[in-house]
Swiss-Prot record:
Bias type Basic and acidic residues, positions: 1-20
Tagged with keyword RNA-binding: yes
Role description: Acts as a suppressor of RNA-mediated gene silencing, also known as post-transcriptional gene silencing (PTGS), a mechanism of plant viral defense that limits the accumulation of viral RNAs. Binds to short interfering RNAs (siRNAs) with high affinity. Acts as a molecular caliper to specifically select siRNAs based on the length of the duplex region of the RNA.
Naturally occurring in which organism (per UniProt): Carnation Italian ringspot virus
Subunit structure: Homodimer.
Protein's name in the database: RNA silencing suppressor p19
Cell division is among the record's keywords: no
Stretches the record annotates as Disordered: 1-27
GO biological process: symbiont-mediated suppression of host innate immune response
GO terms assigned for molecular function: RNA binding
Gene Ontology CC: one annotated term: virion component
Taxonomy of the source species: Viruses, Riboviria, Orthornavirae, Kitrinoviricota, Tolucaviricetes
Family as reported in the entry's similarity comment: Belongs to the tombusvirus protein p19 family.
Phenotypic consequence of W42G: Complete loss of silencing suppression
Amino acid sequence: MERAIQGNDTREQANGERWDGGSGGITSPFKLPDESPSWTEWRLYNDETNSNQDNPLGFKESWGFGKVVFKRYLRYDRTEASLHRVLGSWTGDSVNYAASRFLGANQVGCTYSIRFRGVSVTISGGSRTLQHLCEMAIRSKQELLQLTPVEVESNVSRGCPEGIETFKKESE
């Protein structure tokens, strides 16, 4: 039975669900440890009344295989070195290995999700398309993290990502 999560319970549950596998753990697709902000940092950078605001110190990403979800919060300061580091937070091999531990003979849904500065991207597919899903996820991650804050804000305020406008024009 599921329970509704409200207010501060959300943060408590997020802290409780953290997969702290050190530098990857045995089955985690991630090669970097969770870098979630401390309680003090969280309060400093977040408004309790606006639950939709992201902490500007980094971004959240997750991999899900069926009902098993691995989550990470990674620090990102928009420098080239930081970008290179966080792009290596997982690889196709580490995702395939983690998925193989949880996926049986049946096709199971696989999901990658990333949230950065109020923009959330989720990519889903079946376990048979995992390699293609990994390729799309790394491209999406790289493009999202390289957007300037102005580009992110304009996309959010327009209510759609950049590619959707192009698709609408081509389909008319």
